């Protein structure tokens, strides 16, 4: 009777509680290198680095890591471009592109500062909203894939940095890829001599005689005879010089 009442009222011995450890989701092996690379580029800009568990804690954290990776890569690309543009010395080499180089530097500096501020706002601010960075992330990705910098500006930057075959120093002018034309030194341009081609002889026709044209004979006046001077010899014609 007591056992029946105990079973009904739950007075019996309780079974031992067993716990099962819940394992965290492990990313696939093919995605781990990309995640490690994303963590590396993002942690390089954060004062307090994040771990892989922090980045994969939830779907929102994973999305935040993807956005931060795009911003970090854009930031590093801007810094590399700024370093290369800094090699241009305004006023000394190619002064006509000083304005374009300064405009590129201002644009790259603003984009780099905005990327850095957005990454810090995403990870360091309390209650940061990810949607505030969506527009900037899309612009950063678009600027890397479809940059609004046209090819003429790229050519200007290459000429300023000396990265292409176009010669800028010394006032040389470029006549094409790999061809540099030196500036004129004030000498008049002498046209090449004209060459007249004789008509080709047909089959059976005789070839023209290659003899030069006859030069006019110029007679030299005979000096006046003198009783004491020796008798001069016969007059000679002036030599015929071709081309006169």
Curated annotation (Swiss-Prot):
Annotated stretches, region: Disordered: 178-244
Q: List, as start-end ranges, the regions of compositional bias called Low complexity.
A: 221-244
Its quaternary organisation is:
Oligomerizes. Interacts with UL7; this interaction mediates UL7 incorporation to virions. Interacts with UL14.
The protein's matches in InterPro entries, at most eight in alphabetical order, are given as: Herpes_UL51
Location(s), subcellular = Virion tegument; Host cytoplasm; Host Golgi apparatus
Recorded protein name is Tegument protein UL51
Per the record, the major location class is: virion
Going by the UniProt record, its keywords in alphabetical order are:
Host cytoplasm, Host Golgi apparatus, Lipoprotein, Palmitate, Phosphoprotein, Virion, Virion tegument
**Which family does the record claim for this protein?**
Belongs to the herpesviridae UL51 family.
Attached lipid, kind S-palmitoyl cysteine, located at 9
Describe its function. Plays several roles during the time course of infection, including egress of virus particles from the perinuclear space and secondary envelopment of cytoplasmic capsids that bud into specific trans-Golgi network (TGN)-derived membranes. Plays also an essential role in the maintenance of host cytoplasmic viral assembly center (cVAC) morphology in primary host neuronal cells.
Which GO cellular component terms, listed alphabetically, does the Swiss-Prot or TrEMBL entry include?
host cell Golgi apparatus; viral tegument
What organism is listed for this UniProt entry?
Human herpesvirus 1 (strain 17)
Post-translational modification comment from the UniProt entry: Phosphorylated. Palmitoylation is necessary for Golgi localization.
Task: State the Pfam families in the record.
Answer: Herpes_UL51 (PF04540)
């Amino acid at each position: 009777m007591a056992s029946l009442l105990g079973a009904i009222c739950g007075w019996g011995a309780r079974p031992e509680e067993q716990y099962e450890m819940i394992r965290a989701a492990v990313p696939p092996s093919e995605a781990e290198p990309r995640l490690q690379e994303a963590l590396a580029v993002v942690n390089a800009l954060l004062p307090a680095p994040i771990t892989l568990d922090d980045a994969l804690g939830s779907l929102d954290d994973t999305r935040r890591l993807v956005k931060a990776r795009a911003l970090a890569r854009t930031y590093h690309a801007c810094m590399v471009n700024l370093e290369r543009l800094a090699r241009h010395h305004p006023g000394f080499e190619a002064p006509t592109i000083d304005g374009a180089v300064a405009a590129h530097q201002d644009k790259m500096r603003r984009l780099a500062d905005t990327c850095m501020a957005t990454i810090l706002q995403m990870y360091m601010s309390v209650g940061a909203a990810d949607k505030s960075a969506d527009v900037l992330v899309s612009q950063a990705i678009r600027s890397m894939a479809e940059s609004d910098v046209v090819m003429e500006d790229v050519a200007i930057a290459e000429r300023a940095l000396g990265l292409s075959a176009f010669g800028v120093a010394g006032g040389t002018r470029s006549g094409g890829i790999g061809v540099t034309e030196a500036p004129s030194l004030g000498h008049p341009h002498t046209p090449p001599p004209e060459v007249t081609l004789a008509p080709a002889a047909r089959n059976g026709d005789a070839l023209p005689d290659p003899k030069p044209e006859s030069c006019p004979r110029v007679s030299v006046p005979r000096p006046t005879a003198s009783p004491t001077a020796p008798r001069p010899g016969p007059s000679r014609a002036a030599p015929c010089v071709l081309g006169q």
